[in-house]
Amino acid sequence: MATDGASCEPDLSRAPEDAAGAAAEAAKKEFDVDTLSKSELRMLLSVMEGELEARDLVIEALRARRKEVFIQERYGRFNLNDPFLALQRDYEAGAGDKEKKPVCTNPLSILEAVMAHCRKMQERMSAQLAAAESRQKKLEMEKLQLQALEQEHKKLATRLEEERGKNKQVVLMLVKECKQLSGKVIEEAQKLEDVMAKLEEEKKKTNELEEELCAEKRRSTEMEAQMEKQLSEFDTEREQLRAKLNREEAHTTDLKEEIDKMKKMIEQLKRGSDSKPSLSLPRKTKDRRLVSISVGTEGTVTRSVACQTDLVTESADHVKKLPLTMPVKPSTGSPLASANAKGSVCTSAAMARPGIDRQASHGDLIGVSVPAFPPSSASRIEENGPSTGSTPDPTSSTPPLPSNAAPPTAQTPGITPQNSQAPPMHSLHSPCANASLHPGLNPRIQAARFRFQGNANDPDQNGNTTQSPPSRDVSPTSRDNLVAKQLARNTVTQALSRFTGPQAGAPPRPGAPPAGDVGTHPSVGRTSVKTHGVARVDRGNPPPIPPKKPGLSQTPSPPHPQLKVIIDSSRASNTGAKGDNKTVASPPSSLPQGNRVINEENLPKSSSPQLPPKPSIDLTVAPAGCAVSALATSQVGAWPAATPGLNQPACSDSSLVIPTTIAFCSSINPVSASSCRPGASDSLLVTASGWSPSLTPLLMSGGPAPLAGRPTLLQQAAAQGNVTLLSMLLNEEGLDINYSCEDGHSALYSAAKNGHTDCVRLLLSAEAQVNAADKNGFTPLCAAAAQGHFKCVELLIAYDANINHAADGGQTPLYLACKNGNKECIKLLLEAGTDRSVKTTDGWTPVHAAVDTGNVDSLKLLMYHRVPAHGNSFSEEESESGVFDLDGGEESPEGKSKPVVTADLINHANREGWTAAHIAASKGFKNCLEILCRHGGLETERRDKCNRTVHDVATDDCKHLLENLNALKIPLRISVGEIEPSNYGSDDFECENTICALNIRKQTSWDDFSKAVSQALTNHFQAISSDGWWSLEDVTCNNTTDSNIGLSARSIRSITLGNVPWSVGQSFAQSPWDFMMKNKAEHITVLLSGPQEGCLSSVTYASMIPLQMMQNYLRLVEQYHNVIFHGPEGSLQDYIVHQLALCLKHRQMAAGFSCEIVRAEVDAGFSKKQLLDLFISSACLIPVKQSPVKKKIIIILENLEKSSLSELLRDFLAPLENRSTESPCTFQKGNGMSECYYFHENCFLMGTIAKACLQGSDLLVQQHFRWVQLRWDAEPMQGLLQRFLRRKVVNKFRGQVPPPCDPVCKTVDWALSVWRQLNSCLARLGTPEALLGPKYFLSCPVVPGHAQVTVKWMSKLWNGVITPRVQEAILSRASVKRQPGFGQTTAKRHPSQGQQAVVKAALSILLNKAVLHGCPLPRAELEQHTADFKGGSFPLSIVSSYNSCSKKKGESGAWRRVNTSPRRKSSRFSLPTWNKPDLSNEGIKNKTLSQLNCNRNASLSKQKSLENDVSLTLNLDQRLSLGSDDEADLVKELQSMCSSKSESDISKIADSRDDLRMFDSSGNHPVFSATINNLRMPVSQKEVCPLSSHQTTECSNSKSKTELGVSRVKSFLPVPRSKVTQCSQNTKRSSSSSNTRQIEINNNSKEEN
């Protein structure tokens, strides 16, 4: 159409488009019609249609006038009458187009110009339309997003409500369950008390029965002793009669023989032969027989000890037990009885004292018994005792002695026994004494074994085993006549008879046991030789108590002589008595070693042939040690385990141990710990009688045991530890004690190797060669050190053994001790001054040996043990326990002590080139390698002969150790820069905190170092912000907060290595290890970004407020300009505001603006005029005529709670909200002139209020500011204290987090719980002005191991801060008249006695529930500190009486009705009261509860007051008159808080009587022992939703029953445990019959901002 028509015309005037047209064309090309909506397309179509119509109209009009205009334009000026005009026309027509110029304007050009203009306008309109469409599109998109967000918000709100409902149900259910469980706990506690009472009664009865049983046992023992005494007397009398009968029979026989001889003599006389010689022969024979077979019953009266009631130990043994005879009272001036006398050596006991308990063994009465050899006519078996008489027994005609051996006589000179102190001792058996019987042994041998052990484990007549009962107080000569001694003597008799003469061809006599059993179960014969001058003892002296019966006397045994037995070379049976008095507690060094007492008196020679010389017995009283049984010490040899080297027993191939059962009561245990191994001996009699397994079958074969020479016997005795036999052999003359066997082992070597200390002592005292070496060059000291027998080593060193003797292979005693890991031997050798540097032929040192076995203790001794000063070895040993503690860390003394060994010894290489470090590293002994590495001179780079270093041969663990050998441990610290002065609340913040120690090795690169620093920081931030060891749960807030505080490695501003700055990722030419060593960097400091850089990372780390919240606070200040921070006192408002101001200042300065911070402290006298001057002087408030300033002003108003916000800021609210010249405000200056001012945009105003919530007229200011509330139960305050104390603990432990069981963690948890519980209780009391922020608890001391410091700090905090605030808050609430002043209630200057009682009750409850509960100190220690806490000794009886006694006198039958007098409405902003409902419809519930309270008050009034304060000792009338409405309401709240467990904040208090500690002076108030003692049942009540503080209290009279309140549990004060059941029943009855609702108005509502 118009466009087409226009396009048909020639485009003569179209010129190229300019830049604007090109831009429009480009915008048009970018315009996309496809993206337009339908409405937009319609609008676009309508616009374009209008443009087209306009163009068409213009074109049509121009066409209509085209011709006329053309003619008029072209020819209008010409006239036909003018020829010049025609010429001009011809000229124009004839000239060319380029040469001719138009005479007039061409209309087509005008049209084209118009069309071009329209086209440009069209493009411009299209661009504007596209922009409008894009804006419209964005608007629609934002609307859609807003709708989606609104829908999502609604869904979340709905879900939140559902979750709240569910949580509410769960909480109610948990509360109900807690109450049920509390009831069950009380019931179980009551049951437990009953059971414990019954248990105590049963214990008393049991004790009484035990005492009666002990009395019965004593009586039975006495009766048994009497019976034994009578039986012994009867046996003695019977034996005497039998002896007399035997004498008579013998005498009759002699007479008959004499008659026969006389008859023969008569016949010979008749024959005429000479009868004189024949007369003398019978006389000699008679004399000889009288001497040999007669029994001297007249000289020495003997008595039997054996009891007829004793059981036979083995049924297969048909030989009855034989009695033991003894002389009762030998005369001191006459010779001792030889055959029946017992040689006794009673040694000292190591661990006994006179008067020891009844379990003492009878071993104190057992000495060394050397029996005489019985003649043939005196060896007879009797059931109740051996017969004594002059007639030989026809059944025992064969003597056990050789036929040529005459019966020995006993003509001994008189020896006065020496009395020696012999206290009772415990008898200990050898290790194998309790082994089970071997089934292959002869029953007789088994019976003999039990007989040898009968001193401690023999069964009595009732089959019971008595554990070594104490012996009776008997005469000195009769105390050692025991059955076991008789058995031992006969065993020695039979064994020694084999040593001294042949027995071949001697058949056993009939009725006697076989010869093979002689040594193990001998037949005890009586060999009594007549002596002269011994007085007869009367029968009234009681015999000794048998060893199987408990003694009657509890007094210590009197001294009796210790007998030393000597057998003379004349073979006479001599038993001399000689005593060796030794001190009981004398150390080994104080005793004479190897003393021998030998009787050298000449004995009358017998007319019988002489026997070979018999060895005399040398008995030395052993030093202090383990008291061993008399029958168990003759053989102590348990065989050591067979190990290579020096561990083979000496002469073990031909070892024959001679069975000598001479009773030797030693006071030490010769068996060392290293040689006593279980199962070392497989013979039952080795430990009991000294027999070796190879000897047993020889003794059972009936013939004599084949014996080697005396030197070999000496070695065998020394190897087996047979002290008795060894002492006998050492007393022989001409015996070579230094004789060596084939292996070169001497007797001393064998004894030292097997650890027989007594044998070593005997040999050394006998002057054995101490340095005699075997064929391999090992000395006794080498053997003892190798086997670990440190007592033998000590003895050998004392006898000047060569401690540096080297064997053929170069092994020294120290080397052998280190090789076998014998720590005690090493210590003894080192203290003796041995050389540590002696090397073997292979080049090994003792250090090599110790490391080769991996023995850490041996290596420590070698490296650090110093030779002690003379006389101080004991103290050195005691102090060594902590010197070598590898785990000591920084406190280990090993780090302070220097090694003793030199670097040459540590680095010494063996034949293969290996040092001790090579050996330890190759075997993986990391501990040994670590000890070696501590030596400063260790060369870890030394190579062996294969060119390998220690690192090359090391295991993986040891390689890691070597790599960290020279690592530098440099502490890493975090610094937050300079802390501002303490008036900003930052006095408890620390500038620097050590978080860890970095290990920098030689091969550490800078990349590794950067990663280590970053990882250490990340780990530290996560550690302090996580809930790792915090076991405390949040008891006030259910929402979970982000534990991360927002710090990371990106928060670092700079890092300094010592004094050199460094950044993460930066590298130097030197390695980190070289760099640290060169610059001597002692620490690495990380500086966090702070306000100076416009960041808040350092503020976050210093205050533990999450970084995200601090950034949010800064955004609010920048956006709204007017922000006030408010919260409880101590919530760090001032610190937060100041740090935000610093950060904002540096940000503005970085942007190019000048900035200034103006700080003003507001007090009660701070006026509005002063504030106006502050605003004007700081250029924050400028006149309207003045132009705005570019300077940024930050004003901080602190402590606004001290002034009235409405009065102070009322005139500034509108200008602050609308900062422009359009809303000015007129202020009057001091000169009376008024001027208009306004706040400019570059002014920031921040304020702080130390108040939990606003009240009264201050609420009018709320809408004009942006408020940031710092609640104690929400972030950031909720977790701030937890994070701060956790960082404090981590810093105290040098970057380590202690385990939860650590006392420091428990102390910190307690401090945190005190703050939470305290605020929770104060919030429940409705006293928000007393709430505390975490600032006061930031100074909690963290002292490991000293929880008392924290308790003392808590007492100071309680007395100085908490108590005054609580007291002021309670008094302000309990006061009758409220002052609406500044939103705070003030108490009266002189509170009444009732108000004082309420305050002290509140303090007592808070102290017990919030502070003392959960204290980590034990109860005893805590009670010592409770006196430091004020207000903890208030009697709760006063509080409990308020429930019923604070009402008016006229209202005795019901609860106090609500008072709606006009005084309750005196002020609009007065605090709401806790009203009671109208009681017109009271039921049984009120009467029941009232009666219950009256009964309880009556019982509690009997209790004494817990304080002497006159103001607290109130009588009932005073309480009735003092209680106001507010006081009663507060008391009821205290009452509910004291007893209720339904609140979430106190639900964690344990149900135990120790949790609520009531402190009184008398301790006679069980009614206040615990709050859980009373059993509660919930009473359903309905409450009104808590009203905000600015609402009036008139709603208490109206019937507004919004059912949004939470049901509460009716509770009472604690009652005694005895009244629990009654209270619970009354509560149930009252709760079941009441419809009363308690409407309660809580003024502690939370403000919604």
UniProtKB/Swiss-Prot annotation:
Q: What is its main location?
A: cytoplasm
Record keywords:
ANK repeat, Cell projection, Coiled coil, Cytoplasm, Methylation, Phosphoprotein, Repeat, Synapse
Per the record, the domain of life is: Eukaryota
Polar residues compositional bias, start-end: 411-422, 583-593, 1639-1649
Write out the function statement from the record. Answer: Regulates the dendritic spine distribution of CTTN/cortactin in hippocampal neurons, and thus controls dendritic spinogenesis and dendritic spine maintenance. Associates with the striatin-interacting phosphatase and kinase (STRIPAK) core complex to regulate dendritic spine distribution of the STRIPAK complex in hippocampal neurons.
Per-repeat ranges for ANK: 709-739, 743-772, 776-805, 809-838, 842-871, 912-942
Q: Tell me where in this chain the PTM Asymmetric dimethylarginine is found.
A: 498
Modification Phosphoserine occurs at: 1524
What Pfam families does the record point to?
A: AAA_lid_NAV1, Ank_2, CortBP2
List the protein's name.
Cortactin-binding protein 2
Assembly description:
Interacts with CTTN/cortactin SH3 domain. Interacts with STRN, STRN4/zinedin and MOB4/phocein; this interactions mediate the association with the STRIPAK core complex and may regulate dendritic spine distribution of the STRIPAK complex in hippocampal neurons. Activation of glutamate receptors weakens the interaction with STRN and STRN4.
- Quick check: keyword Transmembrane helix in the entry? no
User: Locations of Low complexity compositional bias?
Assistant: 368-379, 386-396, 1624-1638
Q: Which organism is it from?
A: Aotus nancymaae (Ma's night monkey)
InterPro entries (UniProt xref): Ankyrin_rpt, Ankyrin_rpt-contain_sf, Cortactin-Actin_Reg, Cortactin-binding_p2_N
Which molecular-function annotations from GO does this UniProt entry contain? Answer: protein phosphatase 2A binding
